[in-house]
């Protein structure tokens, strides 16, 4: 509790006053923490429930609130009470007591109170409504307290202390008032609601009581609560914390809800969730249905109608004699019709050519995997190139120099140049689009495919293990079907079977041949499902994965969270995505407990391979066993190993999603930059071909280019180096722990020009990529299992036998922890120091790298504790090396207290 507010003077006009006592000293002269009034009345507040308050005012409205110098604090319930109770003594007669029950805080603060009977009849609190509470004083006065405040303050703030006094300044616009409406017995009065609370902080507010003399019959008293700026500062601090929160940390939870009721819409036996995005609907393995289906829009319909009309007109022009003689600008009519046909319907015809090329590409497996994506990606640009090429050819061969001589127009050459400019612009844009798509696809495949494949397999394992045992149910179903077939054969052969056997083989309500499709272990991909089966995912590699499938996998990782499956929710038709998503490490731990209870046998402390095979196929179960620490060596999975794996899987999935998002943003920005450069090149081409740029203009432009190169040359160089560093070198991803200049940093965000890191104390450090280009970067995440070093010293007089025993016992301990350390750790006598210290070194190798630095130090600390234990058991202690002291002369002893036998003149 903050007592600084209690020591402030009360210069406000709102003070504690009694209507009948005008000679009461001002609060400025009241002693602090002292018994001022020997006989006075007080108020009793007893909070027996989180939302209830009891108070009693002695002598009605003439009861001032006072404080005393006796304060007691404690953390535990050691005072003989069952509730958190702390006391503050205000006076001997009229004390004030506050008791808190069920408070979440470890400590408490109360006011010690005396004996004052309290009568109360509180009304029930209703959310969103004012709370009316009534108390009776000594003179049978009835006091009504109306409380109405924000609901969010009720659950997070503490009980107000009546010792708080008014601050030096008040904000009248934001003050909160609590009205005490007093009536005598026999009267009736209904108090109006006022904004206050039964539970709010007193450290940031102060309260005073004043008398409202406008209504003498009601004699209403008010407690005015003035909120200080500290509450607003705290809110702003919370907002700033949210803004500066790391993306690698769990988001804040506003409500603590139990993590239960997990469910998944469909167990796909590896069919991963589908992603519906408007720019890339993918319903087939390699080619989307959008490209397989023909579109018929308004423009296409007009092109078809124009094609039919122009072909009909062309046929009439070639067959009708009178039309053959018609000339326009000394050109036959059919030439104009051919030109209109190419100009209006050329794009439609070029689309037919693209479809023919795609048809032959689809017949070839390798071309379909590697080339088809890029063909569809640039199909519009290719279609425009073919169309403009046809238009240019038709214009060149139909409108020859004879037409120019006849028309004597200087505009026709410009038309030719404009068509050439359009064609070159389209070809240049086509090359740009193709290069960007090829580079982006190859970058994503080479960099993220392995991590995406591993993350999706982890998601499949989590969903499968949290659901019902599919494989076991399928096996039981097959056994039941075989038993039923045998019974059918025996019945057809005329054998008499006991009715119990038939009833057991054919239970009522079950045919034995139909299985719940939601529980089916293998579900084929339907035409409407965009999922990817695990069999298909396992067959993918860097060489055979298509660009479309890679794009699908990236969308799944970016947009789909880790989910669990609850067998009880399979039959539910109501889908709430938030109830089955793992969005924090806390939920990941809860999901691990749920999965362990679902997979383990009754009463077992570990999960074995046989338990996994109830949910997964044998090859998948073997692969899953290798994911948990210690499982390959011990052939079992512990609770801690399952929890650690699921938490690490959640962290990896979150970091991978952030990496893909940052990479997508960087690629889009790079694409925009290339678009700007391409547009500038196209403008220059137009100026040159149309001969708009004369020699003077070119000279002026070149001078400006030189000036811009001098100003922005270093910037262009920096941008180019940053792009090469990010997409070619690519030394890290989001979430990787790196070491730069001997400082360990975690990658927070990647951009084209900069990278944001988090230091060990969560300090954000921003490095320019051009500067990182020149530094050595150590990446812990991409490192293999890393070693460690532990050194300790013993005295030189330590026997070699003990040193051998130390080595043997440490080696045995490391070998007995195969889930943490590799066996046969190196233990050597490293050095001899000052002829009396022998330095020993232990060089073990972890089963992990140092990406999780906390886990690394935890395992190392356990090993150091074991070394200390071994040294203590072998009585290896620290000793000072004995020193030889040579005394050459000694002064004569002149003393009456000389031991017998000593001579005063004995030489030294």
UniProtKB/Swiss-Prot annotation:
Residues 31-70, 247-256 have a biased composition (Basic and acidic residues). The chain crosses the membrane at residues 298-318, 341-361, 381-401, 411-431, 673-693, 709-729. Not regulated by MgCl(2), ruthenium red or tetramethylammonium-Cl. It comes from the Eukaryota. One of its GO terms (cellular component) is endomembrane system. It is found in: Cell membrane; Endomembrane system. Expressed in tricellular and mature pollen, and in germinating tube. Not detected in leaves or roots. Residues 1-25, 75-85, 156-171, 207-218 have a biased composition (Polar residues). Mechanosensitive channel that opens in response to stretch forces in the membrane lipid bilayer. Exhibits a 6.3-fold preference for chloride over sodium. Regulates osmotic forces during pollen hydration and germination. PANTHER family: MECHANOSENSITIVE ION CHANNEL PROTEIN 5 (PTHR31618), MECHANOSENSITIVE ION CHANNEL PROTEIN 8 (PTHR31618:SF24). This is Mechanosensitive ion channel protein 8. It comes from Arabidopsis thaliana.
